[in-house]
């Protein structure tokens, strides 16, 4: 199968992560995966949800949205509709779970970290790009808090990233574009840590059921892609 952008089945799209993209947040990046572009920012509040008061534990939560011009047809803002749509709710919960999985909140104190992921151009894989980019913004933010003496150490247990895999025209592909996603028989999103532990697997047969062997193949391919993304994260942060 020849992919639209001439990639092999096992290739990621070109990935670029620009740090310190905005002036005001504690951490911010623009992540570009092919034609998908997401701005990820990190802010902090000196308080925690009621269920954490008095525990000396921190918290992290996320919001996700798509700008009106991010899709071929104008996307109506959620605020105009009066409610967050189900897809956005699902994705922002996924982003929050993915990042909470690698943060040691006992070292944050009673503070809440806010992750905001805003899609400025959508061409497939916005949720996985948001997770991968938000981690870099989070690392930068925590490093700044440490530098300012607000926290004693960066409370990151390990790196985390995410990627999509799927089956299109009977072939297993890594990092689906929007065109491929629309034609996919199987669509899957995988979130994994640097040590190879899964945070989340979201997989659905859109048209044709898939076998156990195909599932294993997709998970192995996703792992390869995620390890490459973590390498890119580290290089972006100057750790490699």
From Swiss-Prot:
<dbReference type="InterPro" id="IPR018336">
    <property type="entry name" value="RNase_PH_CS"/>
</dbReference>
<dbReference type="Pfam" id="PF03725">
    <property type="entry name" value="RNase_PH_C"/>
</dbReference>
<comment type="similarity">
    <text>Belongs to the RNase PH family.</text>
</comment>
<dbReference type="InterPro" id="IPR027408">
    <property type="entry name" value="PNPase/RNase_PH_dom_sf"/>
</dbReference>
<dbReference type="GO" id="GO:0016075">
    <property type="term" value="P:rRNA catabolic process"/>
</dbReference>
<keyword id="KW-0548">Nucleotidyltransferase</keyword>
<dbReference type="GO" id="GO:0008033">
    <property type="term" value="P:tRNA processing"/>
</dbReference>
<keyword id="KW-0694">RNA-binding</keyword>
<protein>
    <recommendedName>
        <fullName>Ribonuclease PH</fullName>
        <ecNumber>2.7.7.56</ecNumber>
    </recommendedName>
</protein>
<dbReference type="InterPro" id="IPR015847">
    <property type="entry name" value="ExoRNase_PH_dom2"/>
</dbReference>
<dbReference type="GO" id="GO:0009022">
    <property type="term" value="F:tRNA nucleotidyltransferase activity"/>
</dbReference>
<keyword id="KW-0819">tRNA processing</keyword>
<dbReference type="GO" id="GO:0000049">
    <property type="term" value="F:tRNA binding"/>
</dbReference>
<comment type="subunit">
    <text>Homohexameric ring arranged as a trimer of dimers.</text>
</comment>
<feature type="binding site">
    <location>
        <position position="87"/>
    </location>
    <ligand>
        <name>phosphate</name>
    </ligand>
</feature>
<dbReference type="InterPro" id="IPR036345">
    <property type="entry name" value="ExoRNase_PH_dom2_sf"/>
</dbReference>
<dbReference type="InterPro" id="IPR020568">
    <property type="entry name" value="Ribosomal_Su5_D2-typ_SF"/>
</dbReference>
<dbReference type="InterPro" id="IPR002381">
    <property type="entry name" value="RNase_PH_bac-type"/>
</dbReference>
<keyword id="KW-0698">rRNA processing</keyword>
<keyword id="KW-0808">Transferase</keyword>
<dbReference type="InterPro" id="IPR050080">
    <property type="entry name" value="RNase_PH"/>
</dbReference>
<comment type="function">
    <text>Phosphorolytic 3'-5' exoribonuclease that plays an important role in tRNA 3'-end maturation. Removes nucleotide residues following the 3'-CCA terminus of tRNAs; can also add nucleotides to the ends of RNA molecules by using nucleoside diphosphates as substrates, but this may not be physiologically important. Probably plays a role in initiation of 16S rRNA degradation (leading to ribosome degradation) during starvation.</text>
</comment>
<dbReference type="InterPro" id="IPR001247">
    <property type="entry name" value="ExoRNase_PH_dom1"/>
</dbReference>
<dbReference type="GO" id="GO:0006364">
    <property type="term" value="P:rRNA processing"/>
</dbReference>
<keyword id="KW-0820">tRNA-binding</keyword>
<dbReference type="GO" id="GO:0003723">
    <property type="term" value="F:RNA binding"/>
</dbReference>
<feature type="binding site">
    <location>
        <begin position="125"/>
        <end position="127"/>
    </location>
    <ligand>
        <name>phosphate</name>
    </ligand>
</feature>
<dbReference type="GO" id="GO:0000175">
    <property type="term" value="F:3'-5'-RNA exonuclease activity"/>
</dbReference>
<dbReference type="Pfam" id="PF01138">
    <property type="entry name" value="RNase_PH"/>
</dbReference>
């Amino acid at each position: 199968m020849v992919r639209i952008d001439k990639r092999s089945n096992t290739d990621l799209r070109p990935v670029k992560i620009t740090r310190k993209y905005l002036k005001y947040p504690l951490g911010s990046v623009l992540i570009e995966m092919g034609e998908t572009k997401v701005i990820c920012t990190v802010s902090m509040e000196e308080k925690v949800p009621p269920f954490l008061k008095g525990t000396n534990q921190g918290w992290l939560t996320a919001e996700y949205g798509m700008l009106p011009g991010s899709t071929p047809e104008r996307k109506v803002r959620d605020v105009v509709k009066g409610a967050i749509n189900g897809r956005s709710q699902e994705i922002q919960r996924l982003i929050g779970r993915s990042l909470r999985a690698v943060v040691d909140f006992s070292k944050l104190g009673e503070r809440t970290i806010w992750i905001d992921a805003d899609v400025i151009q959508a061409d497939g894989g916005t949720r996985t790009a948001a997770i991968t980019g938000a981690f870099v913004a989070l690392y930068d933010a925590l490093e700044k808090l440490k530098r300012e003496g607000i926290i004693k150490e960066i409370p990151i247990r390990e790196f985390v990233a995410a990627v999509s895999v799927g089956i299109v025209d009977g072939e297993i592909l890594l990092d689906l574009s929007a065109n491929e996603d629309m034609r996919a028989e199987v669509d899957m999103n995988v979130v994994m840590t640097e040590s190879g532990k899964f945070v989340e697997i979201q997989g659905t047969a859109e048209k044709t059921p898939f076998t156990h062997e195909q599932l294993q193949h997709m998970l192995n391919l996703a792992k390869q892609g995620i390890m490459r993304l973590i390498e890119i994260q580290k290089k972006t942060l100057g750790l490699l």
